[in-house]
Amino acid sequence: MRAIRVHGPDRLPTLGTMQVEISSGPAFAFGEITLPPGGTVRVEAGAMAMTRGDIQMATSTQGGFMKGLKRTLGGESFFVNDFSSGSGGVVGVAAALPGDLDHIMLDGSRALMVQSGSWIASVPSIDVDSKWGGGKTFFSGEGLILLRCTGAGDLLVSAYGALRSYTLVAGEVLTLDTGHVVAFDEGVTYNVRKAGSW
């Protein structure tokens, strides 16, 4: 189960732009995103479970062919769906696998690194771009490509299993299995090593 989100000592402050209600977690979490009149949310292909009210959907590659291809290499879908509301409505989202959802608010000062396959939805002001994790993740077999989320606004991520969030103080060390990492602040210093004799 992918179950952990890590952030540094100066956790990102709250900047809510959409109302999100998460229910039925941690095993089968369901997120209801309430859009104000004129509001839009970008959703991973296949993650929309329902809509209610005045909701229109538009499908695109969000940034063109190359950006869509980079998302595919990062474990996400080539296409994303934008759900917009003229007079207000609700978009319900759920992950493909059983598990939990987490509502994260970014203030634009720092990026959030998200494990490939964990991004579910965000406001259009959040840019989601694939980033190779480098040699330090190559030999781990996990997280070769991470998603780098930048901008200000709301973001929903999913985990296969329950989610637990940790705040690290300066200099603190937390050891995790790479298969259980959902997201972490870009400012968190990390390295990957083999466990045991494998």
List the predicted regions and their residue ranges:
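Phosphate/adenylate-binding glycine loop and adjacent helical scaffold
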Residues: 4-198
